[in-house]
Curated annotation (Swiss-Prot):
It comes from Penicillium rubens (strain ATCC 28089 / DSM 1075 / NRRL 1951 / Wisconsin 54-1255). It comes from the Eukaryota. This is Cyanide hydratase. Catalyzes the hydration of cyanide to formamide. Degradation of cyanide may be important for plant pathogenic fungi in infection of cyanogenic plants. Coiled coil: none annotated. It catalyses: formamide = hydrogen cyanide + H2O. It is an enzyme of class 4 (lyase). The keyword Calcium does not apply. The keyword Lyase applies. GO terms for biological process: cyanide catabolic process.
Length: 358
């Protein structure tokens, strides 16, 4: 698809989520969508696990301390086929805006680190899950499967992609995105401590500065794409909500001020936000600015040697239980996006919801 709109305004969220509170999380999501719409944006990008906030407490507590927090976190995670999701999709439609949303997806009895792309019509055109939860995140989240791997999609505002956290550092996922001609990327980040918290032998890659100012611009350079990096922030009240009784309360400022937006050549395009900034970072995107960057190094095209190096990608769903297709033979698969109820157009979803309420 040739982009219909090559020049437009986009926004990256740099704000605090509604910790452990699904309804407050949805309220804040709609608020920022509305704000981006009022500002004339065609795209808004939310951080990783924006709903109901990143479980950063998992890095701070032992097993027993984690249990009350984990229970509350699960109770406030977002089912994809829900009234809350419909309200978010309706907000996207009302503002005629593309929305990249990161959330803790409750699917049956498991949680997944999920991103969706909502179109200006309120339809979900991409549903993906983080392919591998990072370190202690594996105590909370499962892994994505083949058909939740796709990250890049053709839209009227260009080939847009999104990945979660350290997926933006994964060379294989970057190579796959480059092969699809990605033009605008959303590097969605969670809540991250600053370098002042670093203690040997914890690697420098595990602090905010490394990911905001090294990993993210590297993604922009290697893929030749505009790269928006939305980040979560936290206040003193948020620290209290994420800290078990008896634990010392941290200074929230060590976690804040990390939102970034980079051009396709890796240049920083917006001032770094202040530690107390809660809001949107804006950028004017011009897809034609990508031409010269990719003319020098297009790793998905002229600057690669597929006769020497190739990447095998399996986008087939892997099910615990499969059913025989007795009509056509073989095995019948249901796409994840269909099974979780996100593939139906918004208008159809609304009609179905009204029928159920009668």
């Amino acid at each position: 698809m040739v982009p219909v709109l090559k020049k437009y305004k986009a926004a990256a969220v740099n704000a605090e989520p509604g910790w452990f509170d699904l309804q407050e999380s949805v309220r804040r999501t709609i608020h920022w969508i509305d704000e981006a719409g009022k500002a004339g944006c065609k795209l808004i990008a939310f951080p990783e696990l924006w709903i109901p906030g990143y479980p950063y407490w998992a890095w701070k507590v032992n097993y027993q301390e984690s249990l009350p927090l984990l229970k509350k976190y699960r109770e406030n995670s977002l089912p994809s086929d829900s009234d809350e999701m419909r309200r978010i999709r309706e907000a996207a439609k009302a503002n005629k805006i593309w929305v990249s949303l990161g959330y803790s997806e409750l699917d049956l009895a498991s949680l997944y680190t999920t991103q969706i792309m909502i179109s200006p019509a309120g339809d979900v055109i991409n549903h993906r899950r983080k392919i591998k939860a990072t370190h202690v995140e594996r105590l909370v989240f499962g892994d994505g499967t083949g058909d939740t791997t796709e990250s890049v999609m053709d839209t009227e505002i260009g080939r847009i992609g999104h990945l979660n956290c350290w997926e933006n550092m994964n060379p294989f996922l970057k190579a796959y995105a480059a092969s699809l001609g990605e033009q605008v990327h959303i590097a969605a980040w969670p809540l991250y401590p600053g370098k002042e918290t670093l203690k040997y032998p914890d690697p420098y890659t595990n602090v905010a500065e490394a990911n905001a100012d090294l990993v993210t611009p590297a993604y922009a350079i290697e893929t030749g794409s505009f790269t928006l990096a939305p980040w979560q922030t936290i206040t003193a009240e948020g620290i209290k909500l994420n800290t078990p009784p008896g634990k010392e309360l941290e200074d929230p400022n060590i976690y804040n001020g990390n939102g970034r937006i980079f051009g396709p050549d890796g240049q920083n395009l917006v001032p770094h936000p202040d530690k107390d900034f809660q809001g949107l970072l804006f950028v004017d995107i011009d897809l034609d600015e990508i031409h010269l960057t990719k003319s020098l190094a297009d790793f998905g095209g002229h600057y690669m040697r597929p006769d020497l190096i190739r990447l095998l990608v399996d986008t087939n769903r892997k099910d615990l239980v499969v059913h025989e297709d007795r009509v056509n033979g073989g095995v019948a698969y249901t796409r994840t996006i269909d099974r979780v109820g996100l593939s139906a157009p918004l208008d159809a979803s609304a009609t179905e919801a009204q029928s159920e309420s009668v």
